[in-house]
């Protein structure tokens, strides 16, 4: 007998908080126009939003983004159906993880992390630590796989099938769950290969109990997104893998964890190397400098641990108010419905 799929949840803050105003490089919270004017009119003015028309445009942008988020699950399911019915993959083999796709150094690190004597000190011999910020570089994919994956994504990009934004800040890229990559590619990558590493590197951030993930690819090009402002991820642990192609500049930069005051943060710049991944805590503030030529593609895995986020939402830093959603949700679970606070998305105002 088939079991019903588990319900998916987001935190209610997803519909009000961390709304990015790209023109003025600021994240805002919006519960209504009166609150927004009170909290952000002066901030936006200092960023260059000084006319009534500019402010009205900002409000319109926010309202459109809130509406997009409300419809996200429904529209994502629609896109998945359309893609599964009408898209013909260029390279079907890249949808199913094979060890031949993975770099030898990565496999060695994973093998060590699964051994009975494994510890974090020993694992660090197989990784490159970037300063003392608990940011790690490691080879993940061979270049040939990266090239094929990008060709597959470009093939989909050229199709007239519907496409969703990869996240709330990037405008260009692809949601890998909608294209069918998750079950046989990114899920086994996370469960079989990455979690043994994160269980040693980030035990205090749920690295040993990651139970869901969000997978997407972001694209940077001269006439599209050039850079990415400072932010933190809706994840306990993030893996960012460079897929190529040819480009100049566009390095990542990391400061400190989000609770560190801005005036006390220090920065480290990190170069992209095709096939190599950067592994870091999701709450580590980071961004990307502008590219100056070419195209840059990166695979992003936001890995979630419900044991961690069920206690404290990483985006609002409060106990999550759970909202049932269509689609995949944001990694929250409600094991005991009678003890968890839940609301219906339709009741949010």
Curated annotation (Swiss-Prot):
Residue intervals of the Fe2OG dioxygenase domain: 211-305
InterPro entries with a match to the protein in the record: Oxoglu/Fe-dep_dioxygenase_dom, Pro_4_hyd_alph
Pfam families recorded: OGFOD2-like
Free-text comment on the cofactor: Binds 1 Fe(2+) ion per subunit.
Residues holding Fe cation: 231, 233, 286
Family: Belongs to the OGFOD2 family.
Protein name per the record: 2-oxoglutarate and iron-dependent oxygenase domain-containing protein 2
Species whose genome carries this gene: Xenopus tropicalis (Western clawed frog)
């Amino acid at each position: 007998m088939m079991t019903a799929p588990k319900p998916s949840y987001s935190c209610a803050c997803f519909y009000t908080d961390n709304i990015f105003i790209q023109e003025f490089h600021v994240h805002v919270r919006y519960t209504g126009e009166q609150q927004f004017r009170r909290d952000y009119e002066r901030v936006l003015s200092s960023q260059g939003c000084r006319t009534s028309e500019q402010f009205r445009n900002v409000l319109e942008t926010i309202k459109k983004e809130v509406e997009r988020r409300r419809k996200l699950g429904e529209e994502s399911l629609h896109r998945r159906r359309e893609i599964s019915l009408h898209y013909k993959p260029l390279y079907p083999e890249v949808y199913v993880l094979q060890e031949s796709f993975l770099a030898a150094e990565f496999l060695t690190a994973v093998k060590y992390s699964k051994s009975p004597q494994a510890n974090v000190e020993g694992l660090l011999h197989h990784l490159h630590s970037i300063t003392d910020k608990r940011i790690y570089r490691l080879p993940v994919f061979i270049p040939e796989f990266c090239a094929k994956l990008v060709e597959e994504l470009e093939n989909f990009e050229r199709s007239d099938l519907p496409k969703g934004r990869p996240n709330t800040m990037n405008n260009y890229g692809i949601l890998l769950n909608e294209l069918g990559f998750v079950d046989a590619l990114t899920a086994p990558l996370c469960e079989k290969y990455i979690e043994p590493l994160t269980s040693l590197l980030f035990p205090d951030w749920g690295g040993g109990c990651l139970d869901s993930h969000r997978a997407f690819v972001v694209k940077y090009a001269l006439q599209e997104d050039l850079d990415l402002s400072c932010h933190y991820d809706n994840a306990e642990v993030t893996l960012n893998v460079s897929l190529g192609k040819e480009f100049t500049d566009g390095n990542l930069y990391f400061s400190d964890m989000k609770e560190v005051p801005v005036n006390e943060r220090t920065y480290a710049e990190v170069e992209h190397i095709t096939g190599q991944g950067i592994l870091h805590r999701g709450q580590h503030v980071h961004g990307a400098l502008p590219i100056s030529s070419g195209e840059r593609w990166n695979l992003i895995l936001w890995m979630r641990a419900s044991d961690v986020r069920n206690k404290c939402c990483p985006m609002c830093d409060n106990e999550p108010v759970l909202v049932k959603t269509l689609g995949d949700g944001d990694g929250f679970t409600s094991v005991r419905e009678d003890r968890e606070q839940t609301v219906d998305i339709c009741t949010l105002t």
